[in-house]
């Protein structure tokens, strides 16, 4: 019995030792592969000094407060061995790590207590650590200097959160900048940038004003093995064949109702608290059917119809019944609106939309917009849709039954990544916004149903 147990333990130790040796050997090989970079790899360190740019007037006191930061980057310089690298004037790409020191001892934070009454507190704004990826492109690329732009995207983590600006510990971090880069010698660059950066949680958790900063950035870029030799551009450039696709997408997201929607005032001015059953998060879904046109190696656009649905509409109808029971002015008098019952169809929306894409090989930055033509809340009523660009105020019916994120128009900002040998599928993530406010984040899967190329 003792020998059997001893043999069993020895066997386990043998396999554990074998596993450890194999793991160490693979780790050493991986490190050798990682650190054996070529002349396309570079390292960069940047220092930042900026000022806050608050959107809300009540946060104007923050404009004079400074923010300091440090960036570390590792990048890859393209050399034109692929056509898209030449099309984008030999851009570079890589990963960044960022630290931001926020010198704000106290920030104003307004919310509501359990009875629906507004309250004001002051809290400290914590520091921020961010990591993600970036693209560094050139508006002008010369022999000794270039005028560049950077697009950065990733995640940020805040040491303090739960206030009006940063509602959660994990957030999205975005930045865009422009400025000159000077090639000092074969191994060093000096760069200067003017940058706008934004950090928020894409409305996953409210409140979510976010932090906006305009800053100056000065950095040094180090090329350990010099610069790569660039493959010359072909003149004339290779002929491009335009193409068209019919596509369909499925986009899902969750949103949290804005804080001001969680209470309302009755006709006599009394603040009424929310419904007893709290439903803070709502599912949102958009199905798109449209046409994708690739009219240039770097640019394309979509024209489509958005068929949307949100569970937040049900909440609006429940709130309407509470308002009716409390004798709200919308339900009294000659201009009284009807008291309606909720159904699945009343949560539907229809909107035509367009989107413009900048295509970096398989990766695309996207910017688009849409306008609502129809809402399900009108189904079975004699109420008419308002066509102005105002979000509310012209229709008591819309103010009562239509969720605030679905009033008139909306925009999309995000990215796609094309999959497959023929790039017939894609995944993406977008911020659905209106009036410079993020409604919620969408996660998208799409497929091209039909494709054809223009005749030569």
Question: What is the meaning of each model-derived region?
Answer:
Residues 31-40, 79-91, 140-147, 184-188, ...:
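Short loop/turn motifs that connect adjacent beta-strands in outer-membrane beta-barrel proteins
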Residues 39-41, 64-70, 89, 125-131, ...:
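Residues that define the transmembrane beta-barrel architecture of outer-membrane proteins
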Residues 41-45, 91-95, 147-151, 174, ...:
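Transmembrane beta-strands of outer-membrane beta-barrel proteins
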Residues 45, 70-76, 131-139, 151-155, ...:
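Residues on the lipid-exposed face of transmembrane beta-strands in outer-membrane beta-barrel proteins
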Residues 47-53, 76, 97-103, 153-161, ...:
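Transmembrane beta-strands of outer-membrane beta-barrel pores
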Residues 51-71, 108-121, 256-288:
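Surface-exposed strand-loop-strand hairpins of Gram-negative outer-membrane beta-barrel proteins
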Residues 55-60, 106-112, 160-164, 202-209, ...:
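Outer-membrane beta-barrel translocator domains and adjoining extracellular loop/strand segments
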Residues 72, 212-233, 438-456:
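Outer-membrane beta-barrel "beta-signal"
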């Amino acid at each position: 019995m003792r020998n059997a147990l001893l043999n069993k333990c020895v066997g386990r130790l043998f396999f554990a030792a074998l596993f450890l040796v194999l793991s160490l050997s693979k780790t050493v090989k991986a490190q050798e592969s990682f650190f054996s970079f070529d002349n396309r790899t570079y390292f960069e360190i940047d220092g930042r000094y900026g000022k806050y740019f608050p959107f809300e007037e009540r946060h104007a006191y923050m404009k004079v407060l400074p923010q300091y930061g440090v960036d570390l980057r590792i990048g890859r310089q393209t050399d034109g061995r692929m056509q898209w690298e030449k099309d984008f004037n030999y851009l570079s790409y890589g990963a960044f790590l960022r630290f931001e020191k926020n010198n704000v001892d106290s920030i104003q934070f307004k919310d509501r207590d359990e009875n629906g009454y507004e309250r004001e507190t002051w809290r400290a704004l914590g520091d921020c650590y961010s990591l993600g990826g970036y693209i560094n492109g050139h508006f002008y690329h010369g022999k000794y200097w270039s005028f560049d732009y950077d697009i950065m995207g990733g995640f940020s983590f805040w040491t303090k959160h739960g206030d009006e600006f940063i509602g959660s510990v994990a957030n999205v971090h975005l930045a865009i900048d422009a400025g000159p880069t000077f090639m000092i010698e074969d191994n060093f660059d000096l760069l200067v940038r003017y940058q706008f950066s934004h950090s928020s949680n894409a409305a996953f958790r409210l409140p979510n004003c976010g932090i906006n900063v305009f800053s100056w950035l000065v950095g040094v870029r180090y090329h350990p093995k010099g610069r790569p030799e660039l493959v010359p551009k072909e003149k004339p450039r290779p002929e491009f064949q335009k193409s068209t696709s019919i596509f369909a997408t499925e986009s899902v997201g969750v949103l949290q109702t804005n804080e001001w929607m969680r209470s309302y005032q009755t006709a006599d001015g009394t603040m009424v608290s929310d419904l007893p059953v709290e439903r803070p998060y709502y599912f949102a879904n958009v199905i798109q059917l449209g046409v994708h046109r690739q009219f240039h190696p770097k640019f394309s656009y979509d024209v489509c119809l958005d068929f949307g649905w949100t569970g937040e509409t049900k909440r609006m109808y429940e709130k309407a019944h509470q308002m009716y029971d409390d004798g709200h002015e919308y339900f009294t008098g000659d201009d009284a609106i009807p008291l309606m019952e909720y159904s699945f169809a009343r949560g539907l929306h229809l909107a035509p939309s367009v989107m413009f894409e900048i295509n970096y090989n398989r990766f695309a930055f996207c910017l688009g917009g849409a306008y609502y033509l129809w809402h399900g809340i009108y189904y079975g009523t004699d109420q008419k849709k308002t066509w102005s660009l105002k979000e509310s105020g012209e229709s008591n019916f819309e103010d009562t039954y239509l969720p605030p994120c679905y009033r008139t128009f909306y925009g999309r900002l995000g990215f796609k990544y094309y999959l497959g040998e023929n790039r017939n599928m894609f995944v993406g993530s977008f911020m659905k916004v209106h009036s410079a406010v993020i409604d919620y984040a969408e996660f998208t899967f799409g497929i091209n149903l039909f494709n054809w190329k223009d005749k030569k």
